[in-house]
Amino acid sequence: MKTPLVGRAATAVALSLATAASLLAGAGTTTSASAAGTDFPQPTVHTQKAYDPEKSDFTARWTRADARQLKAMSDPGAPSRTNSMPSAYTMPEVPQDFPDMSNDKVWVWDSWPLTDEKANQYSVGGWEVIFSLVADRNLGFDDRHVYAKIGYFFRKAGVPAAERPRNGGWTYGGLVFDDGVSGQIFDDKSFSHQTQWSGSARIFKGGEIKLFFTDVAFYRNKDGSDRKPYDPRIAMSPGKIHTNKNGVFFTGFSKVHDMLQADGKWYQNGEQNPYFNFRDPFTFEDPAHPGKTYMVFEGNSAVTRGAKACTEADLGYRPGDPQAETVDEVHEKGAMYQMANIGLAVADNKELTKWHFLPPIHSSNCVTDQTERPQIYMKDGKYYLFTISHRSTFASGIDGPEGVYGFVGDGIRSDYQPMNQGSGLVLGNPTNLNFATGFPFDPDYNQHPGQFQAYSHYVMPGGLVQSFIDTIGTKDDFRRGGTLAPTVKLDIDGSSSSVDYSYGDGGLGGFADIPSDTEFKN
């Protein structure tokens, strides 16, 4: 392979070689386990207590004691190609004959709606609008990450999913940015690739749009090796939405504001780790702190890659737990290479062009290396922190499916409690933890055909969840995706949630169904 894989699922592979190796070593064999509860620790006690988001430096932890509940929930006797995880936390199986929402125009993956400060989803002039990462379909699907651009789609609002075309009825509107615009912010313009990664979009008075995204420059040699670390930055570009009888178009998006770069203090940077994660801005307002706009984003804890930085607090075992590990044991397993966190920032002006970092609100040190696309979701007075992670990015000794992980607390900065039996799992792909992972381009023979069926989930109002299709099928018969998956629905109640199998057809709603719930009015 001449060009190293970079990006979400691909970077996950590169960043977790030790984990992948341990899983591949067990390919074709089952993992012995005793009855659930006998070989696993108790989860860490979390209070859900809220702290001041700006005055406190409290950071919640998803501990190893918490994350080991994932394997405790898995059925050790589940046979080859079946799901070993509880159905209440498992996305229904997506059919392999899925339609393509772009009609073969572009690959589509991470997507997000047009929202306000409360995450309400807007239609404008009778049209629903979404933004997506897209790439030319002449590229191999796994080559898309370094060529990603932000595109947009639109469709008529107010049409029930059952009455739309099977592919969701979207029209591809094209790219948001003209060539060269998003590269303006980089002083060093000798980049080999300049790309755009995920973010969020907010609508304001007069139809002004502020598009928050991750602006990225790669500096590679012809053989694909890096001549210096890649440079991801959290950025924003303003534009304006227009509609007519034919659809949606935009003006603006000609200037990019360079807002945040990983600081090396709270958020790992390229000097500390050339493979660091820093991306996926999601902005919102908090009713408990009126007049403030906050942002959550994906980061890594600011330590030098490979430093033995796991702590007792990261492990989180209760005193005297017979299944507890020691810090030395965890370091010997190589878990210090997985150091994910979720960052927080606050806007310094009303234009939302200037921000400053606050301490992270959540860490997964020695548990996983990626907590992607974080978002704050509010319901019944509770604050839910949702994020996504790959099976391949979990640290040695931790295992769980690809999908959505959730945590609940009483404020933005809380002692977040992992949902669902203390595990954090909210919506996983059907997966068999008794067998190796494989890769989206080469599934393990024994894995469930849905192990890679969906990723990059976004939780919408009413508990609806959208995602994109990666790979569906078995090693001897699989199909790659590059389009949006069926929408599913979660029933969320306190620290628990479950998949609503009465929604749609056996729990699967329409493909690419991202409905608006609010009509924009100037």
Residue ranges and their predicted role:
Residues 8, 16, 26-28:
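Low-complexity intrinsically disordered segments
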Residues 37-522:
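Carbohydrate-active catalytic/glycan-binding domains of CAZyme proteins
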Residues 1-14:
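Bacterial Sec-dependent N-terminal signal peptides
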